[in-house]
Structures are given as C-alpha cells and as structure tokens.
C-alpha cells in the first residue's frame, strides 16, 4: 500500500500480468471465466461514514464472497495497525480471518478494494492456483481480482496529487487499467463510469491503449503499416533459412518455426488470453484460440 510515498507507474510487471491471465483461463476454463461477465456493482460495496464499521465491513465481505461464488466461506474482518493494507489467514476454512489496516477506519470507501484483493486470495487458495514468490503471487492476485470483476475498486482507490498519494495492490495504476481494459474488451463493459478518482481515468486510458496494441500486432490483420513491414522482412529472413526457421525474434511477439517438410509456421500470443497460437505461413488465415475461443483474422 503506497500511502503518501511515491507511486510506481508504467508497465514493469506486464509479462507476469499476461502470464496471470493465461493461467486464469487454463485453471478456470473459458466457460467459468464467462460466468464473471458482470462486475461488482458500486452500490453493493458502497461504504459511507455513517455505516457501522464492523457491520459494514462484514456486509461488503459477504458481497465479495457471493461475487466470487464462495458460498460456504465466511470472512471475519478486524482492524489493526500494520504496514500492509490487509492480510488474510489462508486456513482450511470455511472461516477466514481478514485483518485490515487501521487506516481504513477513517478511509471507509476503500474497504471494498482491500477486501476484494483478500477474498481473491481465498478464491485462488481454493483453486490451488499460485505463482512462486510473493511478488509474482500478489501480481496474480491483483490480476485475477481485476479480470474477474472486482479490481476496478483497486484502481479507483488510487489517488495522487502534489501533496499526497494512495495506491492499493502490487500492480501499477496503468497495469490495473490494462487488465480492466482486457476485461472490458471481452465483456463489452465500460468500467470508467464507476470511477470516483480522477487519476483512475487517466490510468485506465493508458491501460486501454496498451491493451489495444496487443490487438494490433502482426500477423493480425489489424497490425499497422510499420509492424506489417517488419513482419514481412522477418518472414523473408525465416524463409531464407532453408526451413530452419528464425525462432524467437527480439522486440516482436511472434516467432517463426519450421514444421518438418511442411510450410513455415508462425506463433504469436492470443491478444485476449496470451496463449500462444501457431499457424502456417500461407497468407490470410482465420485462427481460433483453443483456450479462450477468440477468433483471429491473420495475414501470415
């Protein structure tokens, strides 16, 4: 939790974020991801200063448990002084003890954001899905929280001006915006209408631009002229290698590989789930991602 300190910006964790999206689809399946098409509604996690602190926190926790479809999980929320925003004991259940930073006693509107992250820890724990190392596992948790419909709360908790700053989670604001945009493109929603933080709008716009760049990489037909020109040059070079292929290439997401005695093939990440797709190099090709079922128009 950045509280008054510097806030990191940009996309320093993008590789892990993309791996997290792929891992979600692999562990949950396309059909399960689709059940999260509706995001947490602002009214369901609203918390005003006149609400009872403990009753309100329990109400918000129950709503997030319902959203993540953990009907037999019960969260017991308490507050104490700590350096982190929150903590959850990942026991066998069904009761899970969540501690929130004392700061939330007076910053109640962000309690939903903190609880969204902690309830996702419980969800991933039950799934048996984790990444090695605290940093990568927290990035997975932030990404899953956002992609499955509650992470807009975390981005909305980001506020920064010349005198102060606040940010929850391990992702940068722009990375939260990127995952939100990925979700928005899949489910055709506009999370920006829920933001109360002006800085959240800016971060979301930058994340959306990065997400759209994923959809404009060769060999996708939406690629721009510069990308298409680089792709054509790399393809010629790979074909000149006497069917040994060029393998991975620096600075681009695609790679050319031989296919025995058959045509050269190109692999590239699906812009939706980041799973790599491999298709023959033979002009216009329509590919379907086997993981997220996205249909892609390609010019190989």
Give names to the regions the model predicted.
Residues 134-169:
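Post-HExxH zinc-binding segment in Zn-dependent metallohydrolases
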Residues 1-15, 19, 167-300:
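Pan-zinc metallopeptidase signature
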Residues 111-118, 151-156:
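A structural motif
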Residues 27-93, 104-108:
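Auxiliary, metal-adjacent structural segments of Zn-dependent hydrolase domains
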Residues 2-48, 132:
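N-terminal alpha-helical scaffold/docking segments in eukaryotic complex subunits
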Residues 53, 57, 112, 137, ...:
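Hydrophobic (often cysteine-bearing) scaffold residues that line and stabilize catalytic clefts
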Residues 96-115, 133-136:
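Short pre-active-site segment immediately N-terminal to the catalytic Zn-binding motif
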Residues 113-129, 146:
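Active-site recognition of the HExxH zinc-binding catalytic motif
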């Amino acid at each position: 939790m950045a509280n008054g300190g510097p806030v990191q910006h940009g996309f320093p964790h993008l590789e892990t974020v993309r791996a997290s999206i792929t891992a979600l689809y692999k562990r949950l399946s396309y059909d399960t991801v689709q059940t999260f098409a509706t995001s947490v509604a602002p009214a369901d996690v609203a918390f005003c200063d006149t609400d009872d602190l403990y009753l309100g926190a329990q109400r918000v926790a129950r709503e997030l448990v319902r959203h993540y479809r953990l009907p037999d999980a019960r969260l017991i929320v308490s507050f104490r002084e700590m350096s982190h925003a929150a903590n959850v004991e990942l026991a066998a259940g069904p009761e899970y003890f969540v501690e929130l930073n004392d700061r939330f006693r007076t910053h109640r509107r962000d309690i939903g954001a903190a609880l969204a992250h902690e309830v996702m820890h419980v969800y991933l724990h039950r799934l048996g899905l984790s990444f090695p190392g605290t940093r990568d596992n927290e990035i997975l948790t932030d990404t899953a929280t956002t992609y499955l419909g509650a992470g807009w709360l975390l981005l909305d908790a980001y506020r920064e001006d010349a005198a102060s700053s606040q940010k929850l989670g391990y992702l940068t604001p722009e990375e939260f915006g990127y995952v939100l945009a990925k979700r928005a493109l899949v489910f055709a929603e506009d999370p920006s209408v829920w933001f109360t933080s002006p800085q959240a709008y800016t971060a979301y716009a930058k994340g959306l631009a990065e997400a759209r760049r994923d959809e404009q990489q060769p060999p996708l037909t939406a690629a721009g002229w510069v990308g298409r020109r680089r792709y054509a040059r790399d393809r010629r070079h790979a074909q000149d290698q006497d069917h040994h292929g060029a393998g991975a290439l620096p600075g681009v997401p695609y790679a050319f590989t031989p296919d025995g005695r058959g045509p050269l093939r190109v692999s590239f990440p699906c812009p939706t789930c980041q799973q790599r797709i491999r298709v023959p190099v033979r002009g216009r090709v329509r590919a379907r991602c086997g993981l997220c079922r996205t249909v892609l128009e390609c010019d190989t």
